[in-house]
Amino acid sequence: MLNDASNKENANSDVAADAAARPEQTVLLGLDYGVKKMGMALGNTVTQDARPFDILAMNNGQPADWDNLLGIIDTWRIGRVVVGLPLNMDGSSSMIAKRAHKFARRLAHRLMEQRIHVPVQLFDERLTSVEAREMAWELGLIKNERDPIDDISACLLLQSYLANPDHAEDIATYKAD
């Protein structure tokens, strides 16, 4: 009997040690910023994968429905938001990159107002739209040049982020009181 209790104790401590050794999972939301629409993708830091999620309507660079975006972040228990930063090929900031930066700051502010504790980061997304369109054609996901690929672009953004998270720029992290 003592042996059984000892074995259970060892098994429980092994399970606890295994759980402590595993990296903590964070669900990521990637946003391919746009003036008319914004692609969304979900990613996972443990499995290191990302998948297209949805395309959000934008009104001149701002979400047509902020509550919807904030609700997605809250409902999916997003641990980090990664906003694509569309830099010029030489690395300089484009007009749309400046708008993406402004959007990321507004998003961080809105999250703080709602007391949703999620860091927001910017990540270079040069050529993701070109790559997404090529991939979508090859896989037969689109049939027309005008078919939306924003969610696929967001997915590629997250895959790049997962491979190089140190290259992201922090916008804001909400600190609980």
From Swiss-Prot:
The protein's enzyme class: hydrolase
Pfam family, one: RuvX
Any single GO CC term annotated in Swiss-Prot or TrEMBL for this entry: cytosol
EC number(s) per entry: 3.1.-.-
Localization, UniProt: Cytoplasm
Coiled-coil ranges per UniProt: none
One Gene Ontology term of the molecular function aspect: nuclease activity
GO terms classed as biological process: rRNA 5'-end processing
SMART domains: YqgFc
Role noted for this protein: Could be a nuclease involved in processing of the 5'-end of pre-16S rRNA.
Membership in a protein family: Belongs to the YqgF nuclease family.
Name of protein: Putative pre-16S rRNA nuclease
Organism in which the protein naturally occurs: Psychrobacter sp. (strain PRwf-1)
